[in-house]
Amino acid sequence: MAEAGLRGWLLWALLLRLAQSEPYTTIHQPGYCAFYDECGKNPELSGSLMTLSNVSCLSNTPARKITGDHLILLQKICPRLYTGPNTQACCSAKQLVSLEASLSITKALLTRCPACSDNFVNLHCHNTCSPNQSLFINVTRVAQLGAGQLPAVVAYEAFYQHSFAEQSYDSCSRVRVPAAATLAVGTMCGVYGSALCNAQRWLNFQGDTGNGLAPLDITFHLLEPGQAVGSGIQPLNEGVARCNESQGDDVATCSCQDCAASCPAIARPQALDSTFYLGQMPGSLVLIIILCSVFAVVTILLVGFRVAPARDKSKMVDPKKGTSLSDKLSFSTHTLLGQFFQGWGTWVASWPLTILVLSVIPVVALAAGLVFTELTTDPVELWSAPNSQARSEKAFHDQHFGPFFRTNQVILTAPNRSSYRYDSLLLGPKNFSGILDLDLLLELLELQERLRHLQVWSPEAQRNISLQDICYAPLNPDNTSLYDCCINSLLQYFQNNRTLLLLTANQTLMGQTSQVDWKDHFLYCANAPLTFKDGTALALSCMADYGAPVFPFLAIGGYKGKDYSEAEALIMTFSLNNYPAGDPRLAQAKLWEEAFLEEMRAFQRRMAGMFQVTFMAERSLEDEINRTTAEDLPIFATSYIVIFLYISLALGSYSSWSRVMVDSKATLGLGGVAVVLGAVMAAMGFFSYLGIRSSLVILQVVPFLVLSVGADNIFIFVLEYQRLPRRPGEPREVHIGRALGRVAPSMLLCSLSEAICFFLGALTPMPAVRTFALTSGLAVILDFLLQMSAFVALLSLDSKRQEASRLDVCCCVKPQELPPPGQGEGLLLGFFQKAYAPFLLHWITRGVVLLLFLALFGVSLYSMCHISVGLDQELALPKDSYLLDYFLFLNRYFEVGAPVYFVTTLGYNFSSEAGMNAICSSAGCNNFSFTQKIQYATEFPEQSYLAIPASSWVDDFIDWLTPSSCCRLYISGPNKDKFCPSTVNSLNCLKNCMSITMGSVRPSVEQFHKYLPWFLNDRPNIKCPKGGLAAYSTSVNLTSDGQVLDTVAILSPRLEYSGTISAHCNLYLLDSTSRFMAYHKPLKNSQDYTEALRAARELAANITADLRKVPGTDPAFEVFPYTITNVFYEQYLTILPEGLFMLSLCLVPTFAVSCLLLGLDLRSGLLNLLSIVMILVDTVGFMALWGISYNAVSLINLVSAVGMSVEFVSHITRSFAISTKPTWLERAKEATISMGSAVFAGVAMTNLPGILVLGLAKAQLIQIFFFRLNLLITLLGLLHGLVFLPVILSYVGPDVNPALALEQKRAEEAVAAVMVASCPNHPSRVSTADNIYVNHSFEGSIKGAGAISNFLPNNGRQF
């Protein structure tokens, strides 16, 4: 009802106006004209964008019959008005020529859709030439140009049937402008743009002289059927060609990209869901429940039926029974390893100074390679594999098109400014956000101009570098001025001119007069960025001062839909050319960027209360990573000091205050740290000799990691030496050797396992991680070798000092009186013996422990299935980095994602008709062509991650060739048959490149090669908006046979418009390539970037398969997507299976080494493996809960976790395996007491202090992936090593080795015989049940230790 009432009111107003107006059109009858012929220029107009056509003369006369050339011209321009030889019309031949000229601009945009172009031409042909013109045209204003001349028509009304107008508009509403990736109607609807355009607004713009293109004012009235205007007026209601219908046998229908009705049915793709289901539950959860249930049943059986206690009743193996071959092999392994390290330790301890010198020499020689160290700081070189597909694609793209330009960007908000309401004369009431305020825009303009004129001194060039030396200038790349530089901001809508920004004017619209200012112009340009002259009284252009349009998503952000006035952020972007590494211009660009950053910091401080400013330069990410690395070096140094202090204090065995300085181990601890650092420096130097580049991350992390691992071995070795009682008459060197023989096999097991894991971690293709793994692996090996040599020598010297009661550090000083050293067992050992071990191994506790760890394993498995994969670039930055705010604003306010180029390689012939049709998306092209498939993908952005279709040089080239004002030839003179630019106004340029055809325009092979270079060099302008210089000059390269080649050959400055490729150009022939640019939707995190890459590659593979079917296409031809971020996120496409493979690969040698060094004990190896797997699973599960994503950095930590887990489990497992206690429970208790305390003090407590210090690091990468993850690994390793492992060993641990038990019994009997012989009145009490200091194992004879020492049992029994 309301709509009907409104229409009635409008009709009443129209009738009233007709009654009051002067009747210039007195006759409204069929066969009569309203005007005829031309009367000159419109005297009311000035300042038009181009030379306007003449206006018609008032003439209310009958239509004329036209003949001859006039009729031919009518048939050519207005074919629908041609009715044969008796055709009548209301236009002269001059009017037809003018009509053709005025339609040429619009036809250039609409010609890709023949039905739209025909409907548009037909509409204006009827207005100008219809024989029934007076029926729907009513002249409303005329001008008298001179005495005796007919009045000139300067305004009229056109009456259309509403359906006729709607159908005409609908046929054009989807036609695209490929180069701008926008709709053509966006340039033909004024302030409303494509989003708010409709038939009425589309027609109104065409009749508005304010647009600088219309020669007179036309008021369009759209009437519904049955609505009568009176005075004989009948609305025009001609037939309209539908865009999906052909207009003849040779005329193609509009393509899907330009006509929705032409699109085939495309099913919405299903969202990718990697979750598999079993019934209604996720399959992973079902499998986890089943697995945990099986484990729970096994646990219940173990506890309920007391498997272990039942077997505990069996006593020690009867020595009289024989031993199996496997028992003998296991025993021999223990014996050989123990004897070797015992003899080695004795020898080294006997020659400490010599060994130290011999150890220092190779370390210094290898460390000298550090002088050749080259640090890599480029993030691409650090975090992407050089041989990866993405790096190869990047190299291919950069080789042929140059590196992607360097972005320097500023994002500003004004959180303290309130929004306000503005009544726009054009669009009505609009809400403007606080950032869109004039004083803020003036501040931004001042900043932009200061940055534009920024200069910086270059020592290398010995001159000042300005923006014009390095900027990206798409429309004038060869002779760039400061105002050719690509700067995108809202201020470009005013050509960065303060006067234009402050300009105001009064304007009357629909009887309402109001003042218009910058806000109206902004609204106009945001809706129609391709406008050369807005429709306001300001009459300003929307084009940037460098000549290109500025789309709203490049200038503002934070708006919803098309409500541009509600934007919450202003965006300013300076685009610089990028250059290959080593190019001096790259250093100049970085110098300018450094000055840019300084200027922005000053602006940020100055405008703190007005703006919230975020910014970045292309160099920012690399600078910030390097900055935080340097700032975190003291944190790592503190971590080393903390570990050193702990080792120094904890290694000492203190019995009284007076002996503290003697019993302290500061020198030994410092020596141990020096051994680790020497190993690290030697490893780094070795790889520097090989030319393998290092990084600051390696300098930070490798010493810390190896120090943690090395400190474990140092602590366990010294602790074993202190706890192992010296035998009567045993020399110090033999004592040290005996201690080393007891722990060195497990030290070898840990070091070898860790080194193997690190070397296997080097299989990752990421350079930073690969070099880190190689360096760490070699450092661990060198550290073990130095511990077996240099540190043993240091321990020998320190023991000699302590035995002589000399002070630590100041070894030359000897106190006068000192009490004898105490023999206490220590608090930790007492706690483990009296409290911890009895409680842990109680039968109730053991069952609870198994169930709790089983539940932990199940929860971790489930959490592991939900871990986030990827590495957000924000995590590479310190917490105080200014880039964090920039990335936050980028994700919050940017309305479009990164550009993605679909690149074609060698082997495709673009010059053939089939080749063009398989690429383009206009009329006559394949429904599933290259660009059409990309268009289909943009319809489903949630699955394809594409938001804006690809710009297509093939489409714009075809449109450029279509007979219009674009491609013209000189018809005479010295330039005959050469290209005549559209900017040349000459009668000598009337020849079109292509002849008029009814079908789709396709050049021949010869024409293709001749005209394409002209197209690529043609600068777009209002007469020819299809010129390819700005959009495609660096995207297309051709060989003489139509295949694409390097741009240098085609766009060489020496190449003129000759129509042929000169001989010298062929010298530049390189690999063929071309590219088509689309845009991603906004990508917020690592997962979005990864999935966007996956989707783009799937789309490119699909396109490749279709294009290979085009005749003449090379089978090796390929299309691939390229985005600058691909090199960082490609690894996450396959990191899950690769990580599982790598971790599984690490477990295999770890298991093998464990079995071998544990005396070929398969069960011990399996229990080690089970514990390590549980530690890994629990670690990954807690990673998901603590927000640690899974990526290459965390993967290498998980690889090292395999090695670190060996530290927690192997010592206790070996202690259990070589124990000869009668029952599993007793052996588990003994291993927990003797070695568990050493693992806690030596492994966990040497890791934790250093790890906790890392929590203070500024770099989030260090905090998350080294502090959090290593803390998890250490705590979970500690829990599994000291809680789960003793319990599971007490149930299913390996049996006592009969050979080991037999040998121990023989040794005990021999000792007893010696004791009886030497002390017959004091019978020996030989027992091993109460020993808590050392493990039970067999040791071979030691020469020089005395006869008794050769037969003493290895349980440390004192006599």
From Swiss-Prot:
What membrane topology is annotated for this entry? Multi-pass membrane protein
Q: List locations, semicolon-separated.
A: Apical cell membrane; Cell membrane; Cytoplasmic vesicle membrane
One GO BP: cholesterol biosynthetic process
Expression across tissues is: Widely expressed. Expressed in liver. Also expressed in small intestine, pancreas, kidney, lung, pancreas, spleen, heart, gall bladder, brain, testis, stomach and muscle.
Q: Which GO terms describe its molecular function?
A: cholesterol binding; myosin V binding; protein homodimerization activity; small GTPase binding; vitamin E binding
Q: List the disulfide bonds.
A: 33-90, 39-57, 78-125, 91-129, 113-254, 116-172, 189-197, 243-259, 256-263, 471-485, 525-542, 920-925, 966-1024, 980-989
State the source organism's domain of life.
Eukaryota
| Annotated TM spans | 285-305, 352-372, 633-653, 667-687, 697-717, 743-763, 777-797, 847-867, 1140-1160, 1169-1189, 1192-1212, 1237-1257, 1269-1289
Per UniProt, the keywords (alphabetical) are: Cell membrane, Cholesterol metabolism, Cytoplasmic vesicle, Disulfide bond, Glycoprotein, Lipid metabolism, Membrane, Signal, Steroid metabolism, Sterol metabolism, Transmembrane, Transmembrane helix, Transport
The residue ranges for the Cytoplasmic side of the membrane come to 306-351, 654-666, 718-742, 798-846, 1161-1168, 1213-1236, 1290-1359
Q: Which Pfam families match?
A: NPC1_MLD (PF22314), NPC1_N (PF16414), Sterol-sensing (PF12349)
Post-translational modification, as annotated: Highly glycosylated.
Where does this protein chiefly localize?
Answer: membrane
Extracellular topological segments? 22-284, 373-632, 688-696, 764-776, 868-1139, 1190-1191, 1258-1268
Cleaved signal peptide residues: 1-21
Q: Give the record's family classification.
A: Belongs to the patched family.
Q: What does this protein do?
A: Plays a major role in cholesterol homeostasis. Critical for the uptake of cholesterol across the plasma membrane of the intestinal enterocyte. Involved in plant sterol absorption, it transports sitosterol, although at lower rates than cholesterol. Is the direct molecular target of ezetimibe, a drug that inhibits cholesterol absorption and is approved for the treatment of hypercholesterolemia. May have a function in the transport of multiple lipids and their homeostasis, thereby influencing lipid metabolism regulation. May be involved in caveolin trafficking from the plasma membrane.
**Subunit note:** Interacts with RAB11A, MYO5B and RAB11FIP2. Interaction with RAB11A, MYO5B and RAB11FIP2 is required for proper transport to the plasma membrane upon cholesterol depletion. Interacts with NPC2. Interacts with LIMA1.
Q: What is this protein called?
A: NPC1-like intracellular cholesterol transporter 1
